[in-house]
Amino acid sequence: MGLYRVRVSTGSSFYAGSQNQVQLWLVGQHGEAALGWCLRPARGKETEFSVDVSEYLGPLLFVKLRKRHLLQDDAWFCNWISVQGPGANGDEFRFPCYRWVEGDRILSLPEGTARTVVDDPQGLFKKHREEELAERRKLYRWGNWKDGLILNIASTGIHDLPVDERFLEDKRIDFEASLAKGLADLAVKDSLNVLMSWNSLDSFNRIFWCGQSKLAERVRDSWKEDALFGYQFLNGTNPMLLRHSVELPARLKFPPGMEELQAQLEKELQGGTLFEADFSLLDGIKANVILCSQQYLAVPLVMLKLQPDGKLLPMVIQLQLPHEGSPLPPLFLPTDPPMVWLLAKCWVRSSDFQLHELHSHLLRGHLMAEVIAVATMRCLPSIHPIFKLLIPHFRYTMEINVRARNGLVSDLGIFDQVVSTGGGGHVELLRRAAALLTYSSFCPPDDLADRGLLGVESSFYAQDALRLWEVISRYVEGIVSLHYKTDESVKEDLELQAWCREFTEIGLLGAQDRGFPVSLQSKEQLCHFVTMCIFTCTGQHSSNHLGQLDWYSWVPNAPCTMRLPPPTTKDATLETVMATLPNFHQASLQMSITWQLGRCQPTMVALGQHEEEYFSGPGPKAVLTKFREELAALDKDIEVRNAKLALPYEYLRPSRVENSVAI
């Protein structure tokens, strides 16, 4: 009984407000009060009013709301509702929403304090949890884009996605406008090319967008250098392939006359300075046919040596696997004629483009984040602490992935049009890679140890990934410790166990034999798993996404396709190189897509800087504040280090890491 002060916050994106009336109910532990039709929410505004309630409500548990429309359903994006009372000295309760309110159904918002099932011994929220999850399981259904791939949200297009997973209007307008600009520029360049020759490496300057990236200009000017070629395996846009060699690869067969090379490799191996990048995943992948023209793939192996100054230099390149009964494939060396060596490196860079975009970026970044998101939406209610912890890291992931499946890797999509693995090879490559995913490879401390990169001082990716993982891990531990006091409390959380099982057994098609857990038996195991989820959706994706504009704008450094077969002799000329690299249209389309996906996103939210407040109470806020302080300190450390580097490494700098897979 008494006076309650109610505040209602509406989102600031276009069309977030509504002309429809909204009715509220306050639901307490001892009673319920209808407040009537009390507001028409305005975009970007907080609406405040007071209401006298005659019933005794007790501690507030829910706010219920319903929108009424006469002629047109005008959706409303509600941020949160705050209720303070009874009286001026009454407690304040916060009810997070952060979703669209549509139609005229009643929506129940639980008070923002996170609760596991164990935290609700009276069962005050039991019915709500069950009903919410039942509804979500109907809304968030598993789909299977291609047989043999990890699962995705069941959606044929953006319009049948759950409404809360779609781009807000400002994001949609920016994304579609940038796409239109890129395609318009492509059309202009294509029309101009009719009158111009395409016969030298300088011709690629005609489609290079100056002023977009200083590093891209540096790549254009220095891409032929062996040091820059090797640097990309350490700190480029795909740092996931390089391994420290523990023996010479079995596939590395030495033709007669190569004894000196073998001795040099053995010497580097014994000294612990030999590294390798093996592209065997491409073996047997069918190459694309574009406009009746056959494209080609290689299966390179690169052996590199780490110098005392930290430079990683290539020693030998093998472009094909040896096959019994066939001549040994040639080994290309830095001492070969310049065009021969350059063409071999171009083949490696094109192969890296394929594995990066499909394996490291799409599969390990986008699709893995989607599995985490769908499993979470199906298994954890909005009141659960792990749901509240993870939900900011799913923003826009499902829509950007649907757009990728319908535009980039779809039939007649970008890959089919200009990429050598298109036309079906890209799907087979994804299947192969998905079957090899391991839990440890998503956890930098384990992955970097396995690949032997922990002690490589010039691997800034390794250094920054470890530090960012540790910061995220402490953040997760802070939240988990507020809600799980013992290992037993983790085991007893049936929602948590169902979530873990759904992720591994269903979303990943039964990946427990590759280390992914099907249950969580301790606080430590829970923290490690949740840290993996957040790092995958943030740092890991950013490390494979942010470098695209820098390293792929100069097309010869990362050719999307190759138009002649890999060389079997050492007689390449400039004409051979130009006939092998992408033609004008292919290069222009690569540049346009690279710009659209790699440009600075105006709606970008940096790691940990989300405005949504899903938790209530001082404990979680203190943990988030400490997380932000640690991110800022790491950001500053990286800034100071980068000031001393000829090539600054920015891709895991917290201020540049996006809070979710949103592009």
UniProtKB/Swiss-Prot annotation:
Superkingdom of source: Eukaryota
PLAT domain ranges (all copies): 2-115
Subunit structure: Interacts with PEBP1; in response to IL13/interleukin-13, prevents the interaction of PEBP1 with RAF1 to activate the ERK signaling cascade.
Span of domain Lipoxygenase: 116-663
One of the Pfam families matching this protein, by short name: Lipoxygenase
InterPro entries: LipOase, LipOase_C, LipOase_C_sf, LipOase_CS, LipOase_Fe_BS, LipOase_mml, PLAT/LH2_dom, PLAT/LH2_dom_sf
Assigned EC number: 1.13.11.31, 1.13.11.33, 1.13.11.-, 1.13.11.12
Mutation effect (H393L): Labile enzyme with loss of enzymatic activity
Pathway(s) the chain acts in: Lipid metabolism; hydroperoxy eicosatetraenoic acid biosynthesis
Listed result of changing H426L: Decreased enzymatic activity without effect on iron-binding
Outcome (variant: H356L): No specific effect on enzymatic activity and iron-binding
Protein name (record): Polyunsaturated fatty acid lipoxygenase ALOX15
Function: Non-heme iron-containing dioxygenase that catalyzes the stereo-specific peroxidation of free and esterified polyunsaturated fatty acids generating a spectrum of bioactive lipid mediators. It inserts peroxyl groups at C12 or C15 of arachidonate ((5Z,8Z,11Z,14Z)-eicosatetraenoate) producing both 12-hydroperoxyeicosatetraenoate/12-HPETE and 15-hydroperoxyeicosatetraenoate/15-HPETE. It may then act on 12-HPETE to produce hepoxilins, which may show pro-inflammatory properties. Can also peroxidize linoleate ((9Z,12Z)-octadecadienoate) to 13-hydroperoxyoctadecadienoate.
Biological process terms in GO annotation: apoptotic cell clearance; arachidonate metabolic process; bone mineralization; cellular response to calcium ion; cellular response to interleukin-13; fatty acid oxidation; linoleic acid metabolic process; lipid metabolic process
Bilayer disposition of the protein: Peripheral membrane protein
